[in-house]
Amino acid sequence: MKFYKYCASGNDFVITNADRKEDRSALAKELCNRYEGIGADGFIVILPHEKYDFEWEFYNNDGSRAAMCGNGSRAAAHFAHHINKINPNMSFLTGAGVIKAKVNQDKVEVSLGKIKSVQNTFEELGKTWQLCNTGVPHLVHFCQNLDEFDTMLCQKMRQKYNANVNFVKILDENHLKVRTYERGVEDETLACGTGMGACFYLAFLNKKVQNKVKITPKSGEEVGFAYKNEELFFEGKVKYCFEANYNFS
């Protein structure tokens, strides 16, 4: 199987083309294994579609399916344009709906669409939380010190609410820093696009930031978010790493 390795804002992905849908959960788990496979946060399968430029199947590191992945969507768009020669202005189908993307060399902007849902704040484990769905569910906690991030606490919240868990610090009205515990990876990752989007949207909703901000995830690779016309936009660099053939075990 020919595959392509991509990185976006600290998340890494294995991407391949296929001509039909099928359950690739076991394959995803094998490929994403960092010791016995290629190693990645997620596995993306690009499929043909009659109406849109393409459709994807997205698998988490543990082989589970996910409706959406922000950084994965940017990597998929970069791949579709640079490898599959699709128009730089494209739309593709995900489990969370249609994603629009614009590719400009190594920069990719995607529209994550309208926010699916926001719930009221609540207190648990000594912290204030709010749940926001940006294609997948995210718990968000605003803090003064990101060293408060606790993997064990995040694990408890993730298991109880079946959601990703984010800690966010507001540096000023134009800049946030975020750390994320990702469902499906079951650990902190270097970045999470939909998680950063949830943090930005809740900060904007609570009038703590402007409608356009920079966000720095754990990777240190700064990305941009904007909210306009009731849609969430996400832009940053994407890196093509390498391509190779994989022999199945």
UniProtKB/Swiss-Prot annotation:
Pathway: Amino-acid biosynthesis; L-lysine biosynthesis via DAP pathway; DL-2,6-diaminopimelate from LL-2,6-diaminopimelate: step 1/1. PROSITE patterns: DAP_EPIMERASE (PS01326). Its main location: cytoplasm. It comes from the Bacteria. It catalyses: (2S,6S)-2,6-diaminopimelate = meso-2,6-diaminopimelate. The record marks 138, 182 as: Could be important to modulate the pK values of the two catalytic cysteine residues. Gene3D superfamilies: Diaminopimelate Epimerase, Chain A, domain 1. Pfam families: DAP_epimerase (PF01678). Keywords: Amino-acid biosynthesis, Cytoplasm, Isomerase, Lysine biosynthesis. One of its GO terms (cellular component) is cytosol. Substrate binds at residues 11, 60, 70-71, 164, 182-183, 193-194. It is found in: Cytoplasm. Its EC number is 5.1.1.7. The active site is at residues 69, 192. One of its GO terms (molecular function) is diaminopimelate epimerase activity. Belongs to the diaminopimelate epimerase family. Catalyzes the stereoinversion of LL-2,6-diaminopimelate (L,L-DAP) to meso-diaminopimelate (meso-DAP), a precursor of L-lysine and an essential component of the bacterial peptidoglycan. HAMAP family: DAP_epimerase. Homodimer. This is Diaminopimelate epimerase. It comes from Campylobacter jejuni subsp. jejuni serotype O:23/36 (strain 81-176). The gene is dapF.
